[in-house]
Protein backbone atom coordinates (compact mmCIF):
# COMPACT_ATOMS: atom_id res chain seq x y z
CA UNK A 1 0.00 0.00 0.00
CA UNK A 2 1.36 3.41 -0.97
CA UNK A 3 0.48 6.68 0.62
CA UNK A 4 0.18 9.11 -2.24
CA UNK A 5 0.37 12.76 -1.37
CA UNK A 6 -2.18 14.58 -3.45
CA UNK A 7 -0.80 17.64 -5.18
CA UNK A 8 -2.53 20.90 -4.34
CA UNK A 9 -5.22 21.86 -6.84
CA UNK A 10 -4.10 24.18 -9.62
CA UNK A 11 -7.42 24.34 -11.48
CA UNK A 12 -10.98 25.04 -10.35
CA UNK A 13 -13.75 23.64 -12.58
CA UNK A 14 -17.09 25.44 -12.17
CA UNK A 15 -20.30 24.00 -13.67
CA UNK A 16 -23.80 23.61 -12.28
CA UNK A 17 -23.99 20.04 -13.61
CA UNK A 18 -22.36 17.80 -11.00
CA UNK A 19 -21.49 15.04 -13.48
CA UNK A 20 -19.62 17.46 -15.74
CA UNK A 21 -17.58 18.76 -12.80
CA UNK A 22 -16.76 15.22 -11.65
CA UNK A 23 -15.77 14.08 -15.16
CA UNK A 24 -13.57 17.10 -15.86
CA UNK A 25 -11.86 16.94 -12.46
CA UNK A 26 -11.20 13.20 -12.96
CA UNK A 27 -9.87 13.80 -16.49
CA UNK A 28 -7.54 16.54 -15.32
CA UNK A 29 -6.26 14.42 -12.43
CA UNK A 30 -5.46 11.61 -14.92
CA UNK A 31 -3.14 13.94 -16.85
CA UNK A 32 -1.48 15.31 -13.70
CA UNK A 33 -3.40 18.57 -13.60
CA UNK A 34 -4.69 18.68 -10.00
CA UNK A 35 -8.21 20.12 -9.91
CA UNK A 36 -11.21 20.77 -7.70
CA UNK A 37 -14.84 21.40 -8.58
CA UNK A 38 -17.58 23.87 -7.67
CA UNK A 39 -21.25 24.04 -8.68
CA UNK A 40 -21.94 27.77 -8.21
CA UNK A 41 -20.14 31.08 -8.06
CA UNK A 42 -20.52 31.18 -4.27
CA UNK A 43 -18.91 27.73 -3.99
CA UNK A 44 -16.16 28.81 -6.38
CA UNK A 45 -15.33 31.91 -4.36
CA UNK A 46 -15.26 29.92 -1.11
CA UNK A 47 -12.88 27.38 -2.66
CA UNK A 48 -10.65 30.11 -4.11
CA UNK A 49 -10.44 31.75 -0.68
CA UNK A 50 -9.51 28.44 0.97
CA UNK A 51 -7.22 26.92 -1.69
CA UNK A 52 -4.50 29.39 -2.57
CA UNK A 53 -2.73 27.03 -4.99
CA UNK A 54 -5.46 27.40 -7.65
CA UNK A 55 -4.17 29.38 -10.64
CA UNK A 56 -6.82 28.77 -13.33
CA UNK A 57 -10.62 28.84 -13.21
CA UNK A 58 -12.44 26.87 -15.94
CA UNK A 59 -16.05 28.05 -15.72
CA UNK A 60 -19.26 27.35 -17.60
CA UNK A 61 -20.89 30.51 -18.94
CA UNK A 62 -24.38 29.50 -17.81
CA UNK A 63 -24.75 28.37 -14.19
CA UNK A 64 -28.42 27.87 -13.24
CA UNK A 65 -29.56 31.45 -12.64
CA UNK A 66 -26.05 32.91 -12.64
CA UNK A 67 -23.67 33.98 -15.35
CA UNK A 68 -20.32 32.28 -15.01
CA UNK A 69 -18.79 35.38 -16.58
CA UNK A 70 -19.48 37.22 -13.31
CA UNK A 71 -16.71 35.28 -11.57
CA UNK A 72 -14.05 37.71 -12.81
CA UNK A 73 -15.83 40.70 -11.25
CA UNK A 74 -16.68 38.81 -8.07
CA UNK A 75 -13.02 37.87 -7.61
CA UNK A 76 -11.99 41.48 -8.28
CA UNK A 77 -14.50 42.69 -5.65
CA UNK A 78 -13.38 40.15 -3.03
CA UNK A 79 -10.81 41.57 -0.62
CA UNK A 80 -9.18 38.15 -0.16
CA UNK A 81 -8.94 37.42 -3.89
CA UNK A 82 -8.59 40.77 -5.66
CA UNK A 83 -4.79 40.68 -5.84
CA UNK A 84 -4.57 37.04 -6.87
CA UNK A 85 -3.28 36.52 -10.45
CA UNK A 86 -5.97 34.07 -11.60
CA UNK A 87 -6.46 33.02 -15.21
CA UNK A 88 -9.85 32.11 -16.68
CA UNK A 89 -11.24 29.79 -19.33
CA UNK A 90 -14.95 29.83 -20.13
CA UNK A 91 -17.02 27.03 -21.62
CA UNK A 92 -20.30 27.57 -23.46
CA UNK A 93 -22.91 25.41 -25.11
CA UNK A 94 -23.89 28.31 -27.39
CA UNK A 95 -21.87 27.99 -30.61
CA UNK A 96 -22.79 31.56 -31.60
CA UNK A 97 -21.18 33.25 -28.56
CA UNK A 98 -17.56 32.12 -28.10
CA UNK A 99 -15.94 34.94 -30.08
CA UNK A 100 -18.05 37.65 -28.43
CA UNK A 101 -17.36 36.26 -24.95
CA UNK A 102 -13.64 35.93 -25.65
CA UNK A 103 -13.45 39.52 -26.90
CA UNK A 104 -15.44 40.87 -23.95
CA UNK A 105 -13.65 38.91 -21.23
CA UNK A 106 -10.21 38.82 -22.87
CA UNK A 107 -9.80 35.12 -22.11
CA UNK A 108 -10.20 31.81 -23.94
CA UNK A 109 -13.65 30.33 -24.58
CA UNK A 110 -14.28 26.70 -25.50
CA UNK A 111 -17.49 25.44 -27.09
CA UNK A 112 -19.24 22.45 -25.53
CA UNK A 113 -18.91 19.61 -25.84
CA UNK A 114 -15.38 20.51 -24.81
CA UNK A 115 -12.73 18.42 -26.53
CA UNK A 116 -10.51 16.93 -23.81
CA UNK A 117 -7.23 17.41 -25.70
CA UNK A 118 -8.05 21.03 -26.44
CA UNK A 119 -8.96 21.73 -22.80
CA UNK A 120 -5.85 19.99 -21.46
CA UNK A 121 -3.54 21.82 -23.90
CA UNK A 122 -5.13 25.17 -23.06
CA UNK A 123 -4.91 24.61 -19.30
CA UNK A 124 -1.27 23.52 -19.54
CA UNK A 125 -0.49 26.61 -21.59
CA UNK A 126 -2.22 28.90 -19.08
CA UNK A 127 -0.37 27.28 -16.18
CA UNK A 128 2.94 27.71 -18.02
CA UNK A 129 2.43 31.41 -18.83
CA UNK A 130 2.48 34.28 -16.41
CA UNK A 131 -0.36 36.29 -17.94
CA UNK A 132 -3.63 36.65 -16.08
CA UNK A 133 -6.99 38.31 -16.69
CA UNK A 134 -8.71 40.41 -14.12
Predicted region positions:
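Non-catalytic signal-transmission and effector/linker regions of two-component phosphorelay proteins
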Residues: 1-12, 18-25, 77-85, 108, ...
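Conserved sequence signature across two-component system core domains
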Residues: 14-15, 38, 57, 91
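Acidic catalytic/metal-coordinating carboxylates
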Residues: 39-40, 67-75
Amino acid sequence: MTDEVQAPALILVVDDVQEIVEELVALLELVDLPAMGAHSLADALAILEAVTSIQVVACDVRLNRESGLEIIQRVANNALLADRPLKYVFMTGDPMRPDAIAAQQKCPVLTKPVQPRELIALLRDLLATGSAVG
